[in-house]
Swiss-Prot record:
The active site is at C127. It comes from Methanothermobacter thermautotrophicus (strain ATCC 29096 / DSM 1053 / JCM 10044 / NBRC 100330 / Delta H) (Methanobacterium thermoautotrophicum). It is an enzyme of class 1 (oxidoreductase). Heterotetramer of 2 PyrK and 2 PyrD type B subunits. It comes from the Archaea. This is Dihydroorotate dehydrogenase B (NAD(+)), catalytic subunit. Pfam families: DHO_dh. Catalyzes the conversion of dihydroorotate to orotate with NAD(+) as electron acceptor. Binds 1 FMN per subunit.
Length: 303
């Protein structure tokens, strides 16, 4: 099925370039297996940490024009509980485990704890609504980013991808720090913001945390630009994420320089079937335009 869509990232073979993004249907093995069976080329888990984190109380998401604002707070049951779920993921599923922490040591320990079950580790140094010392507060600092990537690189043997925030002055600088520290790939981008929506009846923010990260179609132009800029400055593969809902969005990311695209918010609108929809459209586009492989499309906007 979709043989012309086959590709690879860091020697991980993918049957197609669509990947479940972190944070959406990624906390249980049953959901991860379902997404893969439904057509995704790989899956990324929800971000998890060494210790359990309850996150923020409801409401944690609110729909806005062009997307969704969320402030879940990186809730997760901790690495020990998560290991039990990862054991149940089907062996044929290319699995990317997303981890976060408040220090390089925490990142390294969390990554090492799940390495045996993962084909790749994704480092969440980019969440815009994380607690102090986590998320974007790391990914906005090139030195901290370097230290986190270096620590994880020393702790695991599987490839690592660093997920970067768009909420910086120069994402190319941060990408360079991650690559220099040993990151094998990059994931661009995490949610934009933080943003806020106010209930005009109560004059209060709708989210319990008041603000959160913006995802969905509205952030796609920012994400595509980030991929485009970073592609020109690094020699490692990029996974593009941010507003992908159809094959046209996927094509834009590929042309900008991504080797694969991650899909998250679109599942809320179109369900898990969105992966198959994107693949069908992408294959038809490639046949119509004379492309024989995904690799031929990567970075074409730079030629």
């Amino acid at each position: 099925m979709f043989f012309m869509l086959e590709t690879s990232i860091c020697n991980i073979e993918l049957r197609n370039p669509t990947i479940l993004a972190a944070g959406v249907m990624g906390s249980m093995a049953s959901s991860l297996n379902r997404i893969y069976r439904g057509g995704a080329g790989a899956v990324v888990t929800k971000s998890f940490s060494l210790r359990p984190n309850p996150g923020y109380r409801n409401p944690t998401t609110v729909e806005v024009t062009g997307g969704v604002i969320n402030a879940i707070g990186l809730s997760n049951p901790g690495v020990e509980a998560f290991r039990e779920e990862l054991k149940l993921v089907d062996e044929e599923v290319p699995l990317i485990a997303s981890v976060y922490g408040a220090s390089p040591e925490e990142f390294a320990s969390a990554a090492a704890s799940v390495e045996e079950y993962a084909d790749m580790i994704e480092l969440n140094v980019s969440c815009p609504h994380a607690m102090a010392g986590c998320g974007a507060s790391i990914g906005q600092d090139p030195e901290l980013t370097f230290r986190v990537v270096s620590a994880v690189k020393d702790a695991v043997d599987v490839p690592i991808s660093t997920k970067l925030t768009p909420n910086v002055t120069d994402i190319v600088e941060i990408a360079g720090s991650a690559e220099e520290a040993g990151s094998d790939a990059l994931t661009l981008i995490n949610s934009l913001g933080p943003g806020m929506k106010i209930d005009i009846k109560t004059a209060r923010p709708i989210l319990s945390n008041a603000f959160g990260g913006m995802s969905g179609p509205a952030i796609k132009p920012v994400a595509v630009r980030c991929v485009y800029d970073v592609y020109r400055s690094v020699d490692i593969p990029i996974m593009g994420v941010g507003g992908v809902r159809d094959f046209q969005d996927a094509v834009e990311f590929l042309f900008a320089g991504a080797r694969a695209v991650q899909v998250g918010t679109a599942i809320m609108y179109d369900g898990p079937e969105v992966f198959m929809k994107i693949c069908r459209g992408l294959e038809a586009f490639m046949m119509a335009e004379g492309f024989s492989s995904v690799d031929e499309m990567v970075g074409l906007a730079h030629d």
